[in-house]
Every structure is written in C-alpha cells, then in structure tokens.
C-alpha cells in the first residue's frame, strides 16, 4: 500500500468550466455516399437517451470532410464554378483529387432536420462546422489570393431561419487548416474568413446569437490561434484546439498507461497561453474542440476499452484545472475510439466514464497538490454536481467531488487530512475480470449497462472510510459534508 499526501485548496477557485463541459463529435464523412451514414440512425430513441447522459453539452458535426460539405445539392450544380484548373501541375492534380473525392459530400435538408431534433431532444447544442475549403479566386502556387465562398453557408442559414432553427446552434469554420487544407491557408486568411463569416451571420439575428468558435488546430498549428485572435478576435466566442497524445496505429496498452503522456496536454495549454500572452484576447476561453487518445482513429482493441479511461479522465481534470471550458470527444461512433458501438449503439467504457463524470462533477475547480514524484497518481477536485438525476444519492451544496486515477502497480491511498473522518461516497470504476482491455466496466463491482435502453442509476459505495484506489483503476469520491464555501453558491 502506497500512501500519497494530497492537499486541496478549497478556499480558492482556480477555474470555472461551462455547464456544457462535455461534448461529442460526429464526423461529417458519415454524410458521404461512401461513409457509414446508412448504418447510423440518428432518430433512435436509444441515441437520444445516451446523449442526454452527457448533457448539457455539444454535439459537433465536423472533421476533415466538413471542409468540403455542401448543403442540399441538386443534380444541376456545376462543380467547375468553384474549380477551373487549366494547367496540369502536380499541385493541381493533388487538389483536384481531393476535390473529386469530397465533392459528393452532401448534407440533405432532412438530415439536418434530424440533427436539430437529435440535439434538442437530448438537451445538447449543435456545433456545426462550415466548409472553409470552398473558395473563390484561388490561383495555383499562390497564397493569400483566395477568399471563403459563403454561398453554401448562406443556403444553410436561410433554411435555418425558414424552419425557426437557431436557438441551439453554434458555428465553426473549417477543420485543421494547419493540417488538411488543400489551399495552404495562412493564419491571416483564417482570421479574414472568420471576419467574413461573422459579417454574414449579422444578417441573420436568430443565428448570430450562437457561439462562433475556431480555428480548430492542433499542436503544430497554434500560430493559427494568434492569427484568428488578430483577425477576428472580437467576433469569436472561444479558441478551439484539437488534441491527441500519439499515433493510434503505433500504440498499444502500455502506451495508454505511460505516465509521461500526461504532461503532453499541459504543454499544449502552455504553448497557447504563450502565443496569446501579448494579445488583447489572451483571456478568451479555450475549448478542446476535438480530442481523443490516439489520432488515426485510435488503437484497435484499446481505444474502446477500459484502459483508455486513464488518459480520458486525466484530460477532463487537467482541462478543467486550466480553465478550458469545453471538451469535445472524438467521436460518438466510428473509428476505434468511438464512445458507442456504431451498429448496436451499446456504450463503450469511455462513455460510462464520461457519464459518471458528468453526473458527479460540477463546474467549480480547485487547486490540488499531489506528492507523487512518479506522476502515476493523478488527483483533481471540483464541486459536486447537485442536480444530477442519475445518482442514487442526492448531494447538497457544499459537497466536493475528488476524482483520481492510479496507473501504478500498487494500491494507493490518498491521504487528505482536511477531510479525515468525513463521509465518503465512492464510485470506483474497474474492468471486468481485471482485464484492462475489457469492453465491460464495473461500478463498485457491478457492470454498468443499459436497462431496457435506459441509463441505470449510479449507486455509491458508502462503506469506504479512505480514498483508496487499486492498481490501474480510477474513480470518484464525493465528500458530502465537506462544507466547501465556494460550492454553496
């Protein structure tokens, strides 16, 4: 048994995250004829219930294909209006292939209607990514010559107004311009594009009330955050980052347990703060607009298993501690990192982890000091969510939720003297049979599963008198009589 001293400064609030902290991503490639849309029923009552288990939150429709997504095309559309290449240079060929591959990416009105119904019915907000790669004035081999073509977006905006949509829709423009742009967009262009989008949205007051976020870039594209701040900082609600720890194709179980990866996320946050340190928009909120464990769709038989939860839980805690307002998980289904099985909609372990977190953890965040030089025990503390309908126990204001993970090889007891003798409600998540690659997760020894397609009640273990975690497990501890002043508000 290893004892680790933990101090929680519950007198000082270090951050406050959004009530809609959790989000899930839906890849726009599913709208493609070659995508998986035919296998996905977004009108399923089961899906409504599962999304409600993460609400209030964001349902993001985005990804690389969003860059090329068109709205309700008819048979007479002429693609050449957007592209008129005359030469046959390698650059032309590359861009043309990308265009031909994506040009069939067409969002039907009926599908958009279903997306609005899904998000409203599950108490989520629809975050919709517009097609930044549809441009005019582009010349091969030149930068800074093209401008975003807003005509497709305006078709969608006009349709939203005609249907009375808008009260639960937020907007993005483009996906990873630092990585997937066929136009080699510059930071300045991205800023100008967002300024243009804001101007268009001003014509539609019912739509302009929603958030406008971007630029949706990863580690290598942090300079685009500065470009957006400089070009359209007054018009965006938040800066969005994409974050993955490693290449899912070259990773295994040991990668997901490697404590050295925990610091990668903090390095990203620090890098963004440094880039914006002299900007008048340095205090603009940050979101993780798309994030998971490994890029390239995750790791087969790992990303959708219990072991993926260590990085997931640490990300939720560390993001909140850095005042990151929203964390959007890639992806609801599809790839190896899907939260749900795309055929049955049965939840994978990370869904259950996020659901428990969403049911127990409030938005007020406190500083935590952990005396563990190995970094294998990670601990976070936030006010308890007191209005959850999914927990058997009902908690009062003043309660504190401590959540922790242990990737080490021995039992760990968190020595938190300030809460010694307090009542502890434990929610410990473990894999079935102790197998880290199990797709079944147990809550206090009982399997978490749907009951007639309904979410089960989350029952606490009230017998524990210490904050203890077995090797390679994670869990939540609610201190119901912590009497934290900041949690009484």
Swiss-Prot record:
The keyword Cell membrane does not apply. One of its GO terms (molecular function) is transferase activity. It comes from Hirudo nipponia. This is Hyaluronoglucuronidase. It comes from the Eukaryota. The active site is at residues 176, 290. The keyword rRNA-binding does not apply. Optimum temperature is 45 degrees Celsius. Optimum pH is 6.5. PANTHER family: HEPARANASE. It catalyses: Random hydrolysis of (1->3)-linkages between beta-D-glucuronate and N-acetyl-D-glucosamine residues in hyaluronate. Hyaluronidase that mediates hydrolysis of (1->3)-linkages between beta-D-glucuronate and N-acetyl-D-glucosamine residues in hyaluronate. Very specific to hyaluronate: not able to hydrolyze chitin, heparin or chondroitin sulfate. Hyaluronidase activity is inhibited by Mn(2+), Cu(2+) and Fe(3+). Belongs to the glycosyl hydrolase 79 family. Keywords: Glycosidase, Hydrolase, Transferase.
